[in-house]
Structure formats: structure tokens, C-alpha cells
């Protein structure tokens, strides 16, 4: 460009590469109520200062690139850029830092978790200047939350639909997860529901395989639901997995479930994707269906302590995208989940206002401004001996799901369901009487087993089962 044709945008432009921290590290910045705030665990490459690493995260997840560009002069970077505004070392680690980044709200499309994640957890996670990067938490401002529908119905509406109050809901995943014919699958569902469970569930990888096509499964499960409801006088449900290879096919399956009159469908929200999940959540609200969410693939993303996305962020994203239930770990079962961390994101799922609490891994105060809550689902390696702990840890607003802990009963599915229902009712009754479930749990179960042969048999089968492994993802030590 000659001096005679120089444009206003190019005036003052100087080509080349400059340090990110000169533009994107702003420790004097005061965050706004409308900013999306992120807490990143940053592990820089040797020789990279934490200020440069934090600024690089802010830049590459917002307006920045590796070199200066003349089109910067066509917009206001101060208005749109992300800012690393605070950095603190991680206690007990020599090369890890928590970097706090503020993003202006105008960077994100309204009502789109997909767009939010594309920016905040996009290409920056492959940035060479960082050895590892993990998104620990997000503060979603009320102004952005109000652009989302959220869960199709929420906790209170679900209880009203089911007419079930004052206790956790009880579920079961049908096993074996793959290989059953549709008719045998429906029979297993019926036996569990008539035995006293509120829900049964498709496993996350049950979609529409050669051994059991989705339409056949839906029909036999609907028959099982209606037959068990007629026998027990209770409202029953089965999580019919609508997850499919295309969003159109997913919605078609949800439409068929609605036509059958069943109360709930299911989606694998991480493998299915946030766009598909939000579409399904909108359909479920419009058509009176509850939506159960499975988190298959989450551990690929969230299990490593120094790289990925913490599940509390995935849980917040799900509440925004939409779901009435989501699997949250058990604390006591076979799957990963430390107690304090798990209870932290359980509160983020259920409550309307959650204070910052680093002892539970919550980096920001979160106000959901009345967005409906999500029921946490405890599932994975649990059985009747775990019932007191689960009731005490998760409280009434939860779903406790016993797959092998129901279908593994020596007398069959229905007695397995009876054992779990008796154990749950005994724990709720004891808690309401003021007894301490943590210290008296085993006594409470043994007392109930005296008048329930089904529970007695279950207690005998699983009396030696333990999953005593330390969690991989743990809280940082205090300073």
C-alpha cells in the first residue's frame, strides 16, 4: 500500500509479533456483572511466564491471534477482547497457576452453549506454549442465562407429574446393556417397575442396533410401563434413549415416544452434542416429556486434573442446554467422584444461588436467576448397603439408580427392586425420625431386612463388595 492510498485502519499499524501480555494481561481490570468469568488451571511450558501464559489463554479464546493484523484497527479490541485479570499459584505445585479470564458478553451468541464452548474451550487447548490447560469453573452472568430455556421442566414440575414427594426417586439400568431382544428387554423393565422402582433406563449405548431396533424397544417398554402402573397404582417411566446418528432421527424417536404417552426420554448429551441436546430439550418442554441426560464420554474430558474441562463446567452447560436429570457420580460406588467436589456440582445443578466455596471447588458465586434445577443421578456400582450413605449425601431431590444392584438379585428383577425400595423407605423413615444415617446406616438396613426376605437376600449377596480406590481428581490443598 502506497502512502497516498493509506487507509485510516492502517494508520499506526506495525506488523510483527508481540507478547500477549502487553494486550491481554490486565491485572487492574474490574470485572463487570455481564462478563463471563473463567478459571483456568494453566501449566506453561518451561520458560513461559505465567502472565504470558494467562494472557495467551485470554487472547486465543477471544480476539487474539499469533501476530498483529491490520484489521485490528477496524474494531474496538478493548470492547471485545478477553482479559486475564488475576493469576494465583496452585498450592503444592511448582508449575501450575489458576488464571482468571473475563470475557465480554458480546462475544457469544445468545442461547448457544455450542458457541460459548467453541470460544472458551476451542483451539486454545492445543496451544504449544502450554503444557496443559484445564477449565475449572465458569461464572455465567444472569444476562446470558436469561437467553436459555434450560431444563424442559425442572425438579418441582417433575415431582408434580409423577406425584412423588419426600424421598429420592429410584431407578435401574437394564442389564446386560447390549444383546437383549426387544421383548426380553421389555420383560426386564416390567419386572423392575412392578417391584417398586420409579424408573428403568436404557443404557447409554442402546440406540438402534441389529439385535434390538429402537421402535420395537419403545413399544415393549411402553407396554411394560402401562402394565406395571396398572398393578401398582404408581406412575412409572423408562428412559427411552432417543440418541441417534442425526438430529432429525433423534427428534423422530422423541415424537414416537410422545405418541406412546410415556413420560420421559433420554439423550447422551456429550456424544450427541450440545446443539442436538438443546433442540431435544426444547421439544421436550413443548410436548410434556421429561428429559434424562447421560454423560457418556465425560471422563475423557474431565478426569485428568491438569487438562480438560472439570465436570462442574459440563454440569453448568447442561443446565443451560437443558435436561431434567444428569448422572453425577455416586461418591460411594465404582465411578470417579470425591465427596466435596461432587456435592459442589450437585448444588450447582439443583440450587438457584450458590456461593463461591473453594473448599468444594466452586470458584465463583453463581446466580441461576430461577432457571429450573436438574436432578442429580447417582449410578454406578451401588447396592442396598450404600442406600443410607446415598440418602444422606444426595437428599430427596435426586435419583438413585441400581443396575446390577437390582438385576443381580439372586431371586430376580422384581425381588431386586423390592429390596431397593424397602431399603430406601427404611432410610427415609429413619432420617425423618432424626436418626443419623452416616453412623446408623448398617443397623437401619439390618432392621429392615428382618421383615423383608428380598432385602435380606440382597444384603447377603453384596455384603463384601467395596470400591476402595482413591479419586484421581481431588481438591487442591489449602494455602
From Swiss-Prot:
Gene Ontology BP terms: photorespiration; reductive pentose-phosphate cycle
CDD domains: RuBisCO_large_I
Main location: plastid
TM stretches of this protein: none
InterPro entries with a match to the protein in the record: RuBisCO, RuBisCo_large_chain_AS, RuBisCO_lsu_C, RuBisCO_lsu_C_sf, RuBisCO_lsu_fd_N, RuBisCO_lsu_N_sf, RuBisCO_lsuI
Catalyzed reaction equations: 2 (2R)-3-phosphoglycerate + 2 H(+) = D-ribulose 1,5-bisphosphate + CO2 + H2O; D-ribulose 1,5-bisphosphate + O2 = 2-phosphoglycolate + (2R)-3-phosphoglycerate + 2 H(+)
Disulfide links within the chain: none
Annotated positions for site Transition state stabilizer: 334
Enzyme class: lyase
Pfam name, any one: RuBisCO_large
N6-carboxylysine modified-residue sites: 201
Residues that hold Mg(2+) according to the record: 201, 203-204
Record-level GO cellular component terms: chloroplast
Propeptide: 1-2
Keywords: Acetylation, Calvin cycle, Carbon dioxide fixation, Chloroplast, Lyase, Magnesium, Metal-binding, Methylation, Monooxygenase, Oxidoreductase, Photorespiration, Photosynthesis, Plastid
PROSITE patterns linked: RUBISCO_LARGE
NCBIfam families linked: PRK04208.1
Homology family: Belongs to the RuBisCO large chain family. Type I subfamily.
Subunit structure: Heterohexadecamer of 8 large chains and 8 small chains.
The protein, known as: Ribulose bisphosphate carboxylase large chain
Amino acid at each position: 500500500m502506497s502512502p497516498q492510498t493509506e487507509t485510516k485502519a492502517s494508520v499506526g499499524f506495525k506488523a510483527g509479533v508481540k507478547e500477549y501480555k502487553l494486550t491481554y494481561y490486565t491485572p487492574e481490570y474490574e470485572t463487570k456483572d455481564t462478563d463471563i468469568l473463567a478459571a483456568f488451571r494453566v501449566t506453561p511450558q518451561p520458560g513461559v511466564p505465567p502472565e504470558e501464559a494467562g494472557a495467551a489463554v485470554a487472547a486465543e479464546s477471544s480476539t487474539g491471534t499469533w501476530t498483529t493484523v491490520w484489521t485490528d484497527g477496524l474494531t474496538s479490541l478493548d470492547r471485545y477482547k478477553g482479559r486475564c485479570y488475576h493469576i494465583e499459584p496452585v498450592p503444592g505445585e511448582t508449575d501450575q497457576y489458576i488464571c482468571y479470564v473475563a470475557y465480554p458478553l458480546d462475544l457469544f451468541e445468545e442461547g448457544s452453549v455450542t458457541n460459548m464452548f467453541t470460544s472458551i474451550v476451542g483451539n486454545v487447548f492445543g496451544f504449544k506454549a502450554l503444557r496443559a490447560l484445564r477449565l475449572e469453573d465458569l461464572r455465567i452472568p444472569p444476562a446470558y442465562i436469561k437467553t436459555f430455556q434450560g431444563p424442559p421442566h425442572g425438579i418441582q414440575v417433575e415431582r408434580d407429574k409423577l406425584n412423588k414427594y419426600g424421598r429420592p426417586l429410584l431407578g435401574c439400568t437394564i442389564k446386560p446393556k447390549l444383546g437383549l431382544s426387544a421383548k426380553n428387554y421389555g420383560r426386564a423393565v416390567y419386572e423392575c417397575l412392578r417391584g417398586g422402582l420409579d424408573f428403568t433406563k436404557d443404557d447409554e449405548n442402546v440406540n438402534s442396533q441389529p439385535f434390538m431396533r429402537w421402535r420395537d424397544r419403545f413399544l415393549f417398554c411402553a407396554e411394560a410401563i402401562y402394565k406395571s402402573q396398572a398393578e401398582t397404582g404408581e406412575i412409572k417411566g423408562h428412559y427411552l434413549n432417543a440418541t441417534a446418528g442425526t438430529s432429525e432421527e433423534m427428534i423422530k424417536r422423541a415424537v414416537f415416544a410422545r405418541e406412546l404417552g410415556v413420560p420421559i426420554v433420554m439423550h447422551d448429551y456429550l456424544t450427541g452434542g450440545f446443539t442436538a441436546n438443546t433442540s431435544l430439550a426444547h421439544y421436550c418442554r413443548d410436548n410434556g416429556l421429561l428429559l434424562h441426560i447421560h454423560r457418556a464420554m465425560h471422563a475423557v474430558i474431565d478426569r485428568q486434573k491438569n487438562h480438560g474441562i472439570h465436570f462442574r463446567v459440563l454440569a453448568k452447560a447442561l443446565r443451560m442446554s437443558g435436561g431434567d436429570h444428569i448422572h453425577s457420580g455416586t461418591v460411594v460406588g465404582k465411578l470417579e467422584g470425591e465427596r466435596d467436589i461432587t456435592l459442589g456440582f450437585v448444588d450447582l445443578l439443583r440450587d438457584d444461588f450458590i456461593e463461591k466455596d473453594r473448599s468444594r471447588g466452586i470458584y465463583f458465586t453463581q446466580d441461576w436467576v430461577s432457571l429450573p434445577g436438574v436432578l442429580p443421578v447417582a449410578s454406578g456400582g451401588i447396592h442396598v448397603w450404600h442406600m443410607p450413605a446415598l440418602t444422606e449425601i444426595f437428599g430427596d431431590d435426586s435419583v438413585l439408580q441400581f443396575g446390577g444392584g437390582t438385576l443381580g438379585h439372586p431371586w430376580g428383577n422384581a425381588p431386586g427392586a423390592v429390596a431397593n425400595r424397602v431399603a430406601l423407605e427404611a432410610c427415609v423413615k429413619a432420617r425423618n425420625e432424626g436418626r443419623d444415617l452416616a453412623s446408623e446406616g448398617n443397623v437401619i438396613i439390618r432392621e429392615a431386612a428382618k421383615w423383608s426376605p428380598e432385602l435380606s437376600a440382597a444384603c447377603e449377596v453384596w455384603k463384601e463388595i467395596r470400591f476402595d480406590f482413591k479419586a484421581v481428581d481431588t481438591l487442591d490443598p489449602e494455602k
